[in-house]
Amino acid sequence: MKRKSLVVLFAMAVLALVAGCGGASKTETRIQQVGPAEAYQLIQQHRDDPDFVILDIRTPQEFVAGHIQGAINVDFYAPDFKQQLDQLPKDKTYLVYCNSGNRSGQAMPIFRELGFREVYELKDGIQSWYQAGYPLVSGQ
């Protein structure tokens, strides 16, 4: 009886190790929603960090009308949106926003699926940023 218990215990230990090793190789995406004050702090902390990217996923027209300084534009409505995201480096940290939080909320599962390491979503989009009094720049 003891021998059977030891065999079962050993088999369970081996399965636990194998399962643990399998999960360790996949990078999990860290997604966090932040308000405008937290987003501003992130931008200030990473001002000179080439591994920090501000990503505006609104249309090019919305982007030109006003965006967060330093942001790059990838249009959520573009037919190749997912492919454009897939071309971006996955190991950088991203602050993502749209107009109201709707598009960025829909985009978060895509970031996860593509294996991005760390993504911050601006809650309620650029509207919340603007209403909080933070600056916007216009043009390209």
Which residue stretches match the model-derived regions?
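Short, surface-exposed ligand- or partner-binding patches at beta-edge/loop junctions that are enriched
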Residues: 96-97
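Structural scaffold elements adjacent to functional motifs in cytosolic proteins
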Residues: 54-56
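Rhodanese-like catalytic fold shared by cysteine-dependent sulfurtransferases
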Residues: 2-10, 15-52, 61-93, 102-140
